[in-house]
Amino acid sequence: MTQLLDVREVALRFGGIVALDGVSFDLEEGQILGLIGPNGAGKTTLFNCLSRLYTPNLGDILFEGRSLVDRPPHRIAEIGIARTFQNLALFSRQSVLDNVRIGGHARCRSDFVSDAFHLPWERRQEEALEEAAWTLLDILGLRGVAYDLPEGLPLGTRKRVELARALAAHPKLLLLDEPAGGLNHEEVATLGELIRRIRDEQRVTILLVEHHMNLVMSVSDKVVALDFGRKIAEGTPAEVQQNAAVIEAYLGTGHKAVDTASGRIPAR
């Protein structure tokens, strides 16, 4: 496999608070990596570094062998990185179809002149974007709500809309920030199947932050655990789940294994 992402000794401070402390790991093409940790461990902060919302104080982040740390956030999608957010960021006054089409514009070439005069190549581009959007709506089971506004849809459906919008940018790396948040057991199971399908059928490498242990362990090829901004474990799902440092981080001393009966990692 070819290495796609290489996180090297990334550190970030907010004043006197250490948010990330020398975090390193890599991700190969075609893998699904689960990033776990108690609340405040630094997971979303690391995601924000990967998507260039934050700039590390130290370390480097390489994507396809090139550093990301000097690239502005609006130039991330064009190199093949897309993400979803814990708090959905859909355009509430645009239809589901339009939300997905907007995602496709992230990797399109356009300028003021072509927009103003509707040049032929731009019309062809718009037609291709709409065709791709309909394909994604079919894949994610959203065709029936294509002309609906997101705000009136159930949470699980809105999460699929945001996922479709991210995929419309044709990413090589997809960052999923707590995709199972607020979903019921059946919806989480369906999400797990969907994540695997996206990896296999769309050939997308996936990095997800998630508190739902059963989901992480069922879909991930590799898991990285953080605590207080440091990496405390890395390995297969089974290895990380039984790691003593991970057990201590989640449950404190005196426990033999992480309890996954509820499907969620207990908060510290």
Tell where the protein language model's regions lie, with residue ranges:
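Glycine-rich phosphate-binding loops of nucleotide-dependent enzymes
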Residues: 2-268
